[in-house]
UniProtKB/Swiss-Prot annotation:
GO terms for molecular function: fructose-bisphosphate aldolase activity; zinc ion binding. The lineage of its organism: Bacteria, Bacillati, Mycoplasmatota, Mycoplasmoidales, Mycoplasmoidaceae. Disulfide bonds: none annotated. This is Fructose-bisphosphate aldolase. The gene is fba. Pfam families: F_bP_aldolase. Keywords: Glycolysis, Lyase, Metal-binding, Zinc. Pathway: Carbohydrate degradation; glycolysis; D-glyceraldehyde 3-phosphate and glycerone phosphate from D-glucose: step 4/4. The active site is at D84 (proton donor).
C-alpha cells in the first residue's frame, strides 16, 4: 500500500533525521530500492521524474510495477510513490493516476504564477490524500531538460509559499543536480537554518549525490528531512556494468554470460548497497 510522506517527514523533523528519496529508472531500480528499504526497516520515497516516467511507458506501468513489487517482496515499510520535478499538468495527471505524492516545480515561473498554481495543486492533492512538495529558487544543474544555476532561494518567497502549508519545501540552497564541480561553493547552511525557522516545514535537499557526508549530516541537523538521491545510484550501476563487460563475462558462452539477468545482477546489487549507505547517512534505519 502506498502512503503520502506527510507523517514520515513530520517524524523525521522531530527526530532530526531524513527520509531517503531515490529516483527509479526501470524494474531493477524499483526492486533494488524497495529491497534496501525493507532490509533496513526504513521508510522510503520511491521517485520518478517525468523523463523516467516516459521511459518506463507511463503511469499504467509504473504504478502497478511498484505496487506489485511491494506485494511480491513483502515490503513492510511505508512507501511513497512520488513524482519528481513535475509540471503543473504532470502533477495533476500523477494524482489522478494514483501517485501518493507529487513535487510541483514552479521555480522557473514568475513567483505569483508559482504561488497560484501551488495553491490549486494542494487543493487537488487533498482530495486524494496525497502529499505535495513545492520549490522556491531553482536547484542548480539539469533535471529532465530544466537547467538551474544553483541560485539561493528568497526567504520572503519561502515564507509566502509556506503559508500554503505544503508537506515539504525544496529551496535553492546552493545545491546542484548531477555531479558537483570542483569549484562548487557548497551548501548555504545559514540559509537552511533561516528557512527552516521561518517556515517550520520539512525541507528537502535535492542533488544529494556527491555532497560530503558531514555536510549532509549538518544540513539534516538544521532542518533537511528529505534527501534526494539519483546520480550516485546511476554511477554505481554503470560502474558494475563496465566491470562485467571489461572482464569479458558477456563473452562466456558456456556460462551464458550474455544473459541480461546475469549482466544486471551486480549492478542491481550496487543500487541496493548505495541505498543502504544513504539510509544510514539519513539516519532512517529502523524508523519504519
Amino acid at each position: 500500500m502506498l502512503v503520502n510522506f506527510k507523517l514520515m517527514l513530520q517524524k523525521a523533523k522531530l527526530g532530526k533525521y531524513a527520509i531517503p528519496h531515490i529516483n527509479i529508472n526501470n524494474y531493477e531500480w524499483a526492486k533494488a530500492v524497495l529491497t534496501a528499504a525493507n532490509q533496513a526497516n526504513s521508510p522510503i520515497i520511491v521517485s520518478v521524474s517525468e523523463g523516467a516516467l516516459k521511459y518506463m511507458s507511463g503511469y499504467s506501468v509504473v504504478i502497478p510495477l511498484v505496487k506489485g513489487l511491494i506485494e511480491s517482496l513483502s515490503v513492510k515499510v511505508p512507501v511513497t510513490l512520488h513524482l519528481d520535478h513535475g509540471s503543473y499538468d504532470a502533477c495533476i495527471q500523477a494524482l489522478q493516476a494514483g501517485f501518493s505524492s507529487v513535487m510541483f516545480d514552479g521555480s522557473h515561473l514568475p513567483f505569483e504564477e508559482n504561488f497560484n498554481k501551488s495553491k490549486k495543486l494542494i487543493e487537488i492533492a487533498q482530495k486524494t490524500n496525497a502529499s505535495v512538495e513545492l520549490e522556491v529558487g531553482t536547484i542548480g544543474g539539469e533535471e529532465d531538460g530544466v537547467i538551474g544555476q544553483g541560485e539561493l532561494a528568497n526567504v520572503d518567497e519561502c515564507k509566502q509559499i509556506a503559508s500554503l502549508k505544503p508537506d515539504a519545501l525544496a529551496a535553492g540552497i546552493g545545491n546542484i543536480h548531477g555531479i558537483y564541480p570542483k569549484n562548487w561553493k557548497g551548501l548555504n547552511f545559514p540559509l537552511i537554518e533561516t528557512i527552516s525557522k521561518i517556515t517550520n516545514l520539512p525541507l528537502v535537499l535535492h542533488g544529494g549525490s556527491g555532497i560530503l557526508e558531514n555536510d549532509v549530516k549538518k544540513a539534516i541537523s538544521l532542518g533537511i528531512c528529505k534527501l534526494n538521491i539519483n546520480t550516485e545510484c546511476q554511477l554505481a550501476f554503470a560502474h558494475e556494468i563496465r566491470k562485467y563487460i571489461e572482464s569479458n563475462k558477456d563473452l562466456d558462452l558456456n556460462k551464458k554470460g550474455y544473459d541480461p539477468r546475469k549482466l544486471l545482477k551486480e549492478p542491481t546489487q550496487a543500487i541496493v548497497d548505495t541505498c543502504l549507505e544513504k539510509i544510514d547517512l539519513c539516519g532512517s534505519r529502523n524508523k519504519a
